[in-house]
Amino acid sequence: MHDRDLLAGRHVVFLSWRDTRNPEGGGAERYLEAMAHGLVARGCRVTVFSAAFAGAPLTETDDGIRFVRRGSKTTVYAQGVWSLLRRRFGRVDLVVDVQNGMPFLSRLVTRKPVVVLVHHVHREQWPVVYPGPLGKVGWWIERWLAPRVYRGCQYVAVSHATRGDLRALGVTGPRIAVVHDGTDPVVPTSATKSATPMLCTVGRLVPHKQVEHAIDAVVALRDEFPTLRLHVVGSGWWEAALHEHAKASDAGDSVVFEGHVDEVRKHEVFESAWVMVLPSLKEGWGLVVAEAGRHRTPTVAYRSAGGPRESVADGRSGVLVEDQQELTWVLGQLLRDPAWREALADGAFDLSRLYTWGHAQRSFAHVIAAAIRGELTDSEDPEEDGDPGRSPT
């Protein structure tokens, strides 16, 4: 039976700590909902369970996906497994357990197939976000408990780096498929490249994104480039700390905090920026890399962050650096050398066109269909059965 025939009428439940409407939602949630839409297009019933937040309905259906929200960002895990145990989702054919550091441990309460979706392993984030015993417990759950609970389950990683990290945790066997992110269509804007030096950083404002490194780079380069501006796009609970850091660094008007913006403004910033800075401690993939690339904006990121080793083609679509000192040096070189910037811009645009949501949805659907059949796979961006040779759209 072809994948599409098998999936039609199946009920897939995603357990996630948040959705895209949540103020703290980001690239991981966009990926989840893109995959959910792909399953809906194949005839699946899809429920996304996530934490409640102010102003959001507890239950709603949007574009074919049923959203159910219960609990807070800490109690959502217990609420999710309780709802699954009490069969409040109705008949379920498969569960996608989204492990953003903390898993739902859904395998303990259901005999249905469970697919574990992982963007990246949080070894570095736990002590940063939760210093002390709480962070140690969280890392123990992710490092030791989860691999044992999900022994024999199918995994989906968004990059080879994440697959490697999972194997290092003991997730063994040919059961970690890689399904890369796609890229959203470009939102038309009237913006053009800034006439004066402009950098941007885009994402949630949380400690492990290390936006301070971008601010420090701008302050260090300001004497040579007095009109240089860094546009910080995004919001989050670390935003006030970043404002304080900019103030303490005497960044002045060199740093522009855009806050949470709509899609049009985000794409205006991508279009205007000369270079995007991605100073994250860890990234599963780096969805914003391809978004910036669609606007011919190359990225500078840390090699040690994991996912950017794949989303950034070092020396062709951007530059991977080793530390904060090299980050500042490379940014300075790019600002001085328009020919180098232009070459990287060409590469960033070309690379961004290789990854599409249509292809990712087909690959994810294949993994889900295989799991329903009781099969495991470690393939990379597979095509659906019965759909050979289709080009990404």
Residue ranges and their predicted role:
Residues 303, 313-325, 333-339:
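Conserved acidic donor-binding segment of nucleotide-sugar-dependent glycosyltransferases
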Residues 281:
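Aromatic "clamp/platform" in nucleotide-sugar-dependent glycosyltransferases that forms part
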Residues 161, 179-182:
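Carbohydrate-associated surface elements
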Residues 156, 189-218, 231:
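Conserved donor-binding/catalytic core segment of Leloir-type glycosyltransferases
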Residues 227, 340-354, 363:
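A short, well-ordered alpha-helix in the C-terminal region of glycosyltransferases
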Residues 243-261:
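Nucleotide-activated donor-binding/catalytic signature segment of Leloir-type glycosyltransferases, i.e.
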Residues 289, 298-302:
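Short hydrophobic beta-strand element within catalytic cores of glycosyltransferases
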Residues 133-155:
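Membrane-proximal helix-turn-helix segments that form the acceptor-binding/catalytic region
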